[in-house]
């Protein structure tokens, strides 16, 4: 199945993102959301037409996606969306936990009252969308974790997390209808913020670990439910 043009999307030729970086971000999101399915071929020429750009930015985007193990570039055959690797998901979760635990412990010792308020505001927004589209909740979940990192000036740490968590995000989108109830995730977020506000780094680390453990619980069921989307391991 080849990628097919939808509406033409024109990327702006402006800084700070290059056209290739903008295209990478968009294609990455489409793969994570399942708009491009594992095994699907991505046509360089069709994508360049679809996004009204030359082929060079498409090649740049494909190379970056290959580095993230979201696509495979096969000489003489083409570029294909890779299947999900359970090992990659677990490895990404391991690395993310190691980084984010350190970040949340730092937040529990130095986050400002303003940062805590920002986090509680995000939790309030999560509650407001909990009975709506799950995609809206996932966006707020992402912003919650990003805000913790930025509250202690760990923007680079968050960029590292963003770079390795794509495989985890693919699972999250597959499990929208069969995942941990959003109310549970909101309670977990609340415990994280409570621990940060209480200046308790041990409790904050434990709360974050429990939160990131959810994917380990749901992963076997998701792999069994969608076997054609996963690598045989």
Locate the predicted segments by residue:
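Short, flexible turn/loop "capping" segments at secondary-structure junctions
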Residues: 40, 73-74, 141, 184-186
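Short linear motifs at protein or domain termini
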Residues: 1-109, 216, 220-233
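Short helix-capping and inter-helix turn/linker motifs at the boundaries of alpha-helical repeat units
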Residues: 18, 117, 180-183
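Alpha-helix N-cap/N′ positions at the starts of helices
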Residues: 76, 99, 121, 184-187
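Conserved amphipathic alpha-helical segments that form helical-bundle/coiled-coil interaction surfaces
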Residues: 109-174, 186-195, 203-213
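Mobile beta-alpha loop/short-helix "lid" or hinge segments that flank ligand
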Residues: 67-72, 164-166, 180-183
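C-terminal-biased regions
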Residues: 177-181, 186-190, 201, 205-233
């Amino acid at each position: 199945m080849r990628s097919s043009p939808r509406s033409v999307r024109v990327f702006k030729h402006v800084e700070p993102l290059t056209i290739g970086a903008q295209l990478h971000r968009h294609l990455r999101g489409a793969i994570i959301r399942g708009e491009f399915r594992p095994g699907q071929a991505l046509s360089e020429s069709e994508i360049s037409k679809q996004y009204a750009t030359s082929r060079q930015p498409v090649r740049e985007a494909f190379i970056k996606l290959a580095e993230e193990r979201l696509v495979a570039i096969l000489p003489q055959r083409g570029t294909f969306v890779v299947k999900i690797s359970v090992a990659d998901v677990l490895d990404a979760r391991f690395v993310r936990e190691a980084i984010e635990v350190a970040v949340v412990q730092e937040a529990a010792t130095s986050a400002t009252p303003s940062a805590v308020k920002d986090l509680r505001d995000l939790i309030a927004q999560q509650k407001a969308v909990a009975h709506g589209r799950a995609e809206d909740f996932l966006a707020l979940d992402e912003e919650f974790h990003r805000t913790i990192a930025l509250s202690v000036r760990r923007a680079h740490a968050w960029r590292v997390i963003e770079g390795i968590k794509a495989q985890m995000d693919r699972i999250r989108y597959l499990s929208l209808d069969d995942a941990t109830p959003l109310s549970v995730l909101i309670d977990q977020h609340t415990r994280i913020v409570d621990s940060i506000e209480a200046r308790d780094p041990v409790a904050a680390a434990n709360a974050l670990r429990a939160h990131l453990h959810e994917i380990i619980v749901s992963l076997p069921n998701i792999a069994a439910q969608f076997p054609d989307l996963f690598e045989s391991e």
